[in-house]
Amino acid sequence: MFITEPISNLKFKGTFHFDEGFYYFRNVGNRLLLGGARNKDFKNEKTYSLETSALIQKTLEDFMMKRILPKGSKKPKIELRWSGTMGMGKIKKPIIEELQPNVFCAVRMSGMGVAIAPIVAERVVKLMKG
């Protein structure tokens, strides 16, 4: 994943998915938050390492320039890059529950954590309020 420097006149607002959800991006103010592309290297993405992958990062940058930003755009500086492990399960539905009094979990986002985290958070808050 990465987030760019502010991009003047960023033309979109919202959360978007591409390639069956393997790519996801959204604006954060006038910055671009982009992640995914793990389907481009399944073998090496099955890891617990938190290191970024050069192949995935390059694939994301290429996607940004070819598919998201207008043709001829100056490439924005990437301000921060990171990666993480994904919680997968046989059922593609998050687990949202109270484990014991005042201990809640929201896990197994099946690779869609960035995209669905706001909705999951709302459900956890609702569960906490009873």
Regions found by a protein language model. Give the residues of each.
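Short, glycine-/Ser/Thr-/acidic-enriched flexible segments
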Residues: 7-9, 39-40, 101, 110-112
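Flavin-dependent oxidoreductases
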Residues: 1-32
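Flavin-binding catalytic cores
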Residues: 8-9, 46-83
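C-terminal catalytic lobe of FAD-dependent flavoproteins
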Residues: 70-130
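Active-site proximal loops enriched in glycine and acidic residues that flank catalytic Cys/His/Asp
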Residues: 6, 27, 36, 82, ...
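Flexible loop/turn segments at secondary-structure boundaries
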Residues: 11, 24, 41-43, 88, ...
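Amphipathic alpha-helix from the class-I
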Residues: 37-47
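Short conserved micro-motifs at the rims of enzyme active sites and ligand-binding pockets
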Residues: 13-15, 45-47, 117-118
